Amino acid sequence: MMSLTELAAALRRPLVVGVTSFVLVSAFAVSELSDVDWEPSHFAAFGEEAREIRAYAEERLGSVVLRPQLGHDGRFFFVQANDPWVLEPEENALILDHPLYRTQRMFYPVVAGGLGFFGPDEIVWAMLVVNLVAMGVGAWAVARIATAMWASPWWGLAFLLNLGFISELDVGGAGIVAGAAAFGAVAMILNGRSWEGVALLTVAALTREVMLIVAVGAGFHLWRRGERREATATAVMPLAAVLSWAIYLRTRIDLEIGSAQVQGIGVPFVGLFEAFESWINNPLDLIVGLAVLLMLALFVRRAVLHDNLIGWAFLGFVPLTVVLTEEVWHSYFDITRAVAPLLTAFVLLVALGDDSPGKVSSESSLSEGA
């Protein structure tokens, strides 16, 4: 029988935090599924008014759960997962609203599509399972980082309880996988396993190209510490992977590159000012929007003041918010998804005090168990 001392030691292990997070988020998913007659298409977020993708899904799955209006991101990833290598774009990718933009985010649909071997019925379940596992992995990674800051690994719950990631789960988005890979990369770099970190940053960037911010930020921090080879690989290899996939896509999809393919990016500050007008009529959006702005200011101050890996890795999300459009800023649902990695990084950077992970050696407490 386990003694109290052994139990306490076990509860301090990041792996326990990850498993606990997986169990909790799975319980949430089970609760949601029970309300929709165990229909996994609920998490694919097909929309009533997205007629072409709705017909595509119903042809392959039969009756599906429909969300109001156009639905959300999961509907695009379902299409992509049915042809993750873009081998038949005329039947799949070209029904997406912005094919080049959507198919650039390839890693999540590749995994959910079983590398191209899963059928539609397996895919719609796999999309959910991948996100549930990623939520546990993300919590584990944040717990590992927290232990490097001489804090309780239970701060890993900052990943699980992140409103942006919870929303991503609900709509079948790729943000959880991207976030888990990014925080996993930071944990690996802190543990002196830079090449594993580079691999995870590549995964993150191929899941959501905005995660190149983390790669460049982490590389910049390593460069300033004199780790030039690791810094170069950290910044360059994820970018090379993203560019390589982009080139491949342009051999598969016969569309010209244009600004219409880029979503959510506009003239600096315009989106924020336009969103503020709509916030006046919605107190919840106003409160969340102002809280995000305050968090951005505090994050910049803390990152510059304490000069650590967490700060530099995620600092680039701050200037990104300046160019987000009104469509992203106007609702708490969308803005928290856009800055979800920054929300968790903010907890690590601000709430845990001055013991910064960027100043912990590779022989830190990260090496002490899972």
Spans of features found by a protein language model:
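Membrane-lumen/periplasm interface segments of specific transmembrane helices
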Residues: 25-42, 215-220, 224-319
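Membrane-interface alpha helices of multi-pass inner-membrane proteins
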Residues: 183-188, 195-222, 236-240
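Start-transfer (signal-anchor) and selected internal transmembrane alpha helices
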Residues: 1-56, 367-370
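Specific aromatic-rich, kink-prone transmembrane helix
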Residues: 141, 161, 168, 177-197, ...
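Membrane-embedded glycan-lipid processing machinery
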Residues: 100, 104, 115, 122-133, ...
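Transmembrane-helix signature of polytopic, membrane-embedded enzymes
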Residues: 122-126, 140-161, 180
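Transmembrane alpha-helices of multi-pass, membrane-embedded glycan-processing enzymes
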Residues: 100-104, 108, 112-116, 127-141, ...
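Short hydrophobic/aromatic helix or loop-helix immediately within or flanking a transmembrane segment
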Residues: 71-90, 94-120, 341
